[in-house]
């Protein structure tokens, strides 16, 4: 089941990444982030490791929140990776800064910092 789930998540990730490339052509130089399902995430639904181009998603959250994970959490984390690839890190910017918010708007999503999902 996890292998099928991961395949689906990777397909959605690639679709989101391609949509972002249309808005931000510079992203074509970067691969879509690699997705890892992680059983260790119990409070955080997703975590982006920007320099490794990798996103960890809480596997346990999928049991009760599959749609929200695919429609909210995954794009949220992909937006972090796109923000990093396009604009880099800045001590003056937090992870949910203006550029990240703009990317979320391009995805047609609210720029929420936190989730309310339960395991």
Predicted regions and their residues:
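Walker B catalytic acidic pair
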Residues: 77
């Amino acid at each position: 089941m996890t292998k099928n789930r991961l395949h689906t998540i990777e397909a959605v990730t690639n679709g989101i990444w391609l949509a972002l490339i249309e808005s931000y052509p510079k992203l074509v130089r970067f691969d879509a982030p690699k997705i890892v399902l992680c059983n260790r995430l119990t409070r955080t639904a997703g975590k982006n490791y920007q320099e490794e181009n990798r996103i960890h998603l809480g596997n346990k959250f999928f049991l009760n929140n599959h749609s929200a994970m695919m429609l909210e959490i995954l794009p949220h984390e992909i937006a972090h990776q796109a923000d990093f690839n396009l604009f880099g890190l800045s001590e003056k910017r937090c992870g949910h800064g203006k550029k990240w918010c703009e990317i979320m708007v391009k995805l047609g999503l609210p720029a929420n910092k936190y989730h309310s999902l339960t395991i």
